[in-house]
Structure formats: structure tokens, C-alpha cells
Amino acid sequence: MAQIQARFFTEEEKYKVDDVPFSIPATSEIVDLSNLINKLLETKNGDHKPVEFDFLVKSQFLRMPLIKHMEAEGISTEVVVEIEYVEKITAPQPEECMMHDDWVSSIAGTEEWILTGSYDKTCRIWSLEGKTIMTITGHTEAVKDVTWVKKDSLSCLLLSASIDQTIQLWEWNTERNKIKALHCCRGHAGSVDSIAVDASRTKFCSGSWDKMLKIWSAVPSEEEDEYEETSDRPRKKQKTEKMGLTRIPIVTLSGHSEAVSSVLWSDVDEICSASWDHNIKIWDVETGTVKSTLAGNKVFNCISYSPLSQRLASGSTDRHIRLWDPRSKDGSLVLCSLTSHTGWVTSVKWSPSHEQQLVSGSLDKLVKLWDTRSCKAPLYDLAAHSDKVLSVDWTDAGLILSGGSDNKLYSYRYTASLSDVGA
């Protein structure tokens, strides 16, 4: 049997083995290598309990016999191959299931609470244990997106966007558990599908079916903006006196030729937007101009940006998740495609604490946990939903969240190994 010379290394001090080459069978797979490392650790420490390990060669997870991986990566069998090993991530476990009255379109998790938006026209605030704390009513059509603005000792500001063409700025008094509509943000001429708050927590942007992006103040005030009503807007849906003071946008960004499906802030003065026109645009907020365009060949449904890896992830109707470097001179080149979903990818979210990991949801009813060092297959499929997955998110408390057209919000307990924590 052909042998390969390999040197094993790890960042995890307690699992380190001697830094010398070992001769191993070329056909070795994960289980074989894991057994070898455990035997070496047992020799060093008789009390060692077997651990499941994962292995990386040239920063890519081993998912096939070693020799096949080396051939795929163009690694010579004549040299000593460097193999990194990390403790295998355990599968996320479904923890809570929170029922809604209609589809769960959007989720925003924090350390303490979960905010959801639903097609039943309401938003809900949940405890991490799955208890409803507050139901927020006011929108006249389905809620499409929700997000937290800021939190202080007694209250939180939050936003909701709706098919009713408005965005609501709410104040939630956490001490008394009371909600107040502060501002009704008006100016879009179509469903508002995506909202995102900037790092200063003083501004937010929105993307709509009217093909426009708009930037708004997120700071509450006692002043009402003047808003000119368009004649084709149905008057029976106006309940502005109950919805807080009217607010109009600071600026409108025009450039997409189809609906804007997803928006985010990638820097203090930079916004990314994804559209049904097959393009992702990166905007300079100061000048209101497009800095660059990442062109696809199918509809983009969602984008997510990781400040840790400085990479953009996109999900499309062609079932693929693509990773981009928006700052590269060749920004339009896809770094990697994650291909496993069998339906439209509806939602992607980078982990807030692990630069290699992201989660995705799809019309195929599955939530998938990915590590970008394994582009060919997800780490895990989470198959809790009985219908389409519409939204995914993370909390800082180690939960993955997903909502779908089965009217359910699921939370999954997830603990990553220390070696995967991003800088």
C-alpha cells in the first residue's frame, strides 16, 4: 500500500503531538487520521479520552481519501504534507420552536432577545428560551424585515419594514414592556424588503421593490417631516396618526433596474445592495454613487458581509452561495461557490464570531451550516422545518436561528471549537 509522509499540527495546545513526519497510508480518511492522533495522544497521556477530529490540508477540510485530496489540490506525494487538525464541530441541536400565525419572514437575534417579522403583519420579541415577550402591531401588510437599532439600560429602538411600503421606528421600554411607534418612514413606492443599520446606530438604509435604496435617520425626534402623498396610494391604508411622526429619507440611491432584495453596510460610508437585476452594487454613501458592481447571471435574494473575513456572501435563485472579496481589484471574481441547496437560497448570514462560518436557508426546507474551508459540502444540514426556510440568523449567545413558511422559528444550540474563532 502506498505511503505518504505527513506532519500533523494544531493550534489547540492540549492536543499537540510531536512535530515529526509520520508515514501513513495514502488512502487514509478522516476516521483513520483521527484514530492515529488519538493513539499518539494516549501514548503521551494515559488519561486521554478519544476525541473526534477534522483535518485540513492547504486550508481545506479533508472530505475524501488523502491521496485524492492531494491530487485535487495539486500537492506532490514526494514531499511531507502538512496536515492541520481541529476538534470536530458537533452538530447544532434544535432547542426551541416558536410558533407564529403566518410565515416567519425575518429574524434579528441579540444576546438577550430574538426579534421576528411575519406575514401576519406583526413583529414579535421573544426570549432566548422561546417565550413571547411582546407582539407589535401596526403594519397593514406583511412584515418583510426587522432589525435592532440600539439598546440602553431601559429601552431599545427597533425597525420593521413591510409590504405596506413603510418602515416603522419603534421604542420598546424593556422595564415596563411597552412599545411606542416613534416614526413612520415613508417614501418608497413598493414593498420594503430589506433594512440595515449603520455602525454608528444613527442611520439606516432600506431596499425596495421600487428598485430604490434610501438612507434615513435612525435618531428619534419630536419633529415631523412633510410627506407628499401620491395619488395612486390607497388612502384606507393610512394610519399615520397611530404610527408615529412621519419621516422622509435623507437621500435616495438609484441604479438598480429591478427590485432591491437585500442591503447592508460594509463600512461606515459604504453600502452593498443586491437586486433581482442580477447585480450587487457597492455604494459610496458620501457621494451617492456606485463604486463597483459585482455581476451575476441570476437573481440575488440575499447578501451578508463578514467584518472578520471582509468577505461578502450572496444567495441566488440558482441554488448557489457565492463568496466575494468586494475590495479586490477583481471584485467581480467569485472566490468560492458553496453548492448543496436544491432550491432558491433565501437567506445567508456570516457568523458574528467565526470568520470561516456561515449559515444559509433555502426553499428546499433546509438550513445549512458551512465552513468556507469546505466549499464542496456543508458541515451540517439542519432539517427541522417542514416547509420553505425564509430567514436565518445568529445570536451572540451561540444560537443559530431560522424561520420559515411552516410558521415556525427554530433555535439551535451551537458551540464551535476554539480553534475556529476568528481574530
Curated annotation (Swiss-Prot):
It is found in: Nucleus, Nucleolus; Nucleus, Nucleoplasm. It holds the Pfam family WD40. Gene3D superfamilies: YVTN repeat-like/Quinoprotein amine dehydrogenase. It comes from the Eukaryota. CDD domains: WD40 (cd00200). GO terms for cellular component: nucleolus; nucleoplasm; PeBoW complex; preribosome, large subunit precursor. The keyword Disulfide bond does not apply. InterPro entries: G-protein_beta_WD-40_rep, NLE, WD40/YVTN_repeat-like_dom_sf, WD40_repeat_CS, WD40_repeat_dom_sf, WD40_rpt, WDR12/Ytm1. Component of the PeBoW complex, composed of bop1, pes1 and wdr12. The complex is held together by bop1, which interacts with pes1 via its N-terminal domain and with wdr12 via a high-affinity interaction between the seven-bladed beta-propeller domains of the 2 proteins. The PeBoW complex associates with the 66S pre-ribosome. Interacts (via UBL domain) with mdn1 (via VWFA/MIDAS domain). Component of the PeBoW complex, which is required for maturation of 28S and 5.8S ribosomal RNAs and formation of the 60S ribosome. Belongs to the WD repeat WDR12/YTM1 family. This is Ribosome biogenesis protein wdr12.
